[in-house]
Design a protein with these regions (language model features):
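SF2 helicase/translocase ATPase core recognition
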Residues: 1-4, 140-178
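Conserved Helicase C-terminal RecA-like lobe
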Residues: 1, 7, 11-138, 143-149
């Protein structure tokens, strides 16, 4: 439904809102449980001329998306082998699903920490050393750790969400092994 609405908006208004549409389409599969997708179509002056909305997916509180189930299973397997998991999530702003994933993982019995942008770049390595000593999983946006940090204690890397910046992806992937 969202895809068809966006195609209609492109036909009607051109490509001015492709950036917002791209972000919405990339994040919607993971955030559809939490957020209705609402994309404003703006004209050249910035005036909103239309809005495209996709409804929030109605799940019972205990229901998980298949991707969430797979993450829990992977973390369980890695923990059984004494391996910590570094879980990268691209959309940590207006479509942040870290709180939901942290709750799901904690309810499954894992110790989870989440690094966010409020930790100053020069203090991130110390924050990680101090706060993840007993953690099983670290949730983080790859932009926060793409350069200058060694995350050797997290040998398993999961790109739960992938953006479109290949440089960030490659840099973040190398944090655990260099």
């Amino acid at each position: 439904k969202l895809e068809n609405s966006l195609k209609g908006a492109i036909k009607a208004y051109g490509t001015r809102s492709l950036s917002a549409m791209l972000q919405a389409l990339l994040s919607n599969p993971d955030s559809c449980v939490l957020y209705p997708e609402c994309i404003e179509i703006k004209d050249k002056t910035g005036m909103v001329v239309d809005t495209v909305t996709a409804p929030r997916l109605a799940l019972a509180p205990e229901e998980l998306l298949p991707k969430e189930i797979e993450l829990v299973n992977l973390v369980r397997k890695e923990k059984s082998e004494s391996r910590k998991v570094l879980c990268y999530m691209t959309f940590t702003g207006t479509r942040d699903i870290r709180p939901r994933l942290q709750k799901i993982l904690e309810e499954a019995g894992f110790r989870v920490k989440s690094l966010d942008a409020s930790v100053e770049p020069k203090k991130r390595e110390a924050w990680i050393a101090k706060n993840t000593r007993d953690a099983d999983v670290l949730l983080v946006n790859p932009e926060l750790v793409k350069t200058g940090l060694d995350l050797y204690e997290f040998p398993t890397v999961v790109f739960y969400q992938v953006g479109y910046n290949v440089f960030t992806l490659r840099q973040a992937a190398r944090r655990s092994w260099r």
